Amino acid sequence: MPKSIVRTYSQYTKEALTLLSGLIRAARIERKLSTQEVAERAGISRSMLQRIEKADPKCEIGAVFEVASIVGVPLFNAELSSPKLANNIKRTEEKLALLPQRARKPQKAVDDDF
């Protein structure tokens, strides 16, 4: 049986997870939605939703984003179904088109001057 990998997360990551999970929990409670109701709408288990609300870093990012969308927490400074998000996606795709497909380390120049 493979050993479980122990990961460490930066302080910034931990704080961002805590913030997002708090926003999700607050929005759910403000909208008077039960954990079971949100979990069913997101297609996840109730225990997964509880882990999301406790800022567990091992939760799938897609599940976290779906729950945020369901309870009305805007992501990336954009309102739900906002053209602003679509514009950001387009700009990112344009930038990626200009960049090389792979990131390669620069090779050391050979000094062959004698």
What are the residue ranges of the model-derived segments?
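A short, Lys/Arg-rich alpha-helix, primarily the initiator
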Residues: P2-E30
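Short basic helix-loop element that most often maps to the first helix and adjoining turn
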Residues: G22-E37, E66, E93, L98-A103
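Short alpha-helical DNA-recognition segment
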Residues: K32-M48
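Short amphipathic alpha-helix starts
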Residues: A42, Q50, L75-A78
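DNA major-groove recognition helix of helix-turn-helix/homeodomain DNA-binding modules
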Residues: E60-A78
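Short, charged recognition helix plus adjacent turn
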Residues: A78-F114
